[in-house]
């Protein structure tokens, strides 16, 4: 299976650089994965596609203000993208610099000195030397780390709009974007309809934006991300399936979390890292349907939806979305695959 099989041409003007005024005003492409039938709806119509007894599973991870700036002691400028916090004074980060900082050197993160303890590939391990911790630095100076394809600096509204309304557990470098369409009003309508809701956590890493670099899909090595699938979520899933309801994952992060916890065919609580890679030929044990945004060409996420719905059907759906001028990627429109 070739990575190029998952390529497609997207007109640049269809990349959504800004969100719509209202979260739930986006469009929704409905795809029947059995028949391949495609239909166009508004996102608010999603309420009509779910039934009492269904279970929606959301990722409640919160995006960190992970973009920070600083300098070497020489004054040379540095840009940070915080990837993972080990403890309040110890964290992993990407660093953009003309010349990479050396292991053992001291550098500034905003106004605070930090020591470079280690480097692994493009990832640095830093320890803060000053009084402030990384949470305080992000709170005081941090920027929302918008995806590179938006080609703009973050603005004030991004702090709210690049965050789901139910975000709770701080740790992501990118938003679980399928959830961005859900307004507080729509969440209430879902509850009022008798549809159950559950929350898992997957802290999205920056690797989510990276295209697959190898020619053969099977050779790709996934980046690891931290997830939590609590026992009460597993109980809800078992109950839903026993009662004939559907488990509907909101976003590929929820899909990957649930399928990690259900790898042995039976859903079990899971806490730790996952590097699960779902591509055509892989089996789904837990998820019956999903809401997802449109994904980048050659990405692991377009491979995931192709595994769920069949590659030809996904490519046709994407061609339809391009012809109908859907908006793509993080601030773009969504699909309901069932």
UniProtKB/Swiss-Prot annotation:
It comes from the Bacteria. It catalyses: 7-aminomethyl-7-carbaguanosine(34) in tRNA + S-adenosyl-L-methionine = epoxyqueuosine(34) in tRNA + adenine + L-methionine + 2 H(+). Keywords: Cytoplasm, Queuosine biosynthesis, S-adenosyl-L-methionine, Transferase. Its main location: cytoplasm. One of its GO terms (biological process) is tRNA wobble guanine modification. It is found in: Cytoplasm. InterPro entries: QueA, QueA_dom1, QueA_dom2, QueA_sf. GO terms for molecular function: S-adenosylmethionine:tRNA ribosyltransferase-isomerase activity. It is an enzyme of class 2 (transferase). Pathway: tRNA modification; tRNA-queuosine biosynthesis. Disulfide bonds: none annotated. Its EC number is 2.4.99.17. One of its GO terms (cellular component) is cytoplasm. SUPFAM superfamilies: QueA-like. NCBIfam families: PRK00147.1, queA. Belongs to the QueA family. Transfers and isomerizes the ribose moiety from AdoMet to the 7-aminomethyl group of 7-deazaguanine (preQ1-tRNA) to give epoxyqueuosine (oQ-tRNA). Monomer. HAMAP family: QueA (MF_00113). This is S-adenosylmethionine:tRNA ribosyltransferase-isomerase. It comes from Francisella tularensis subsp. tularensis (strain WY96-3418).
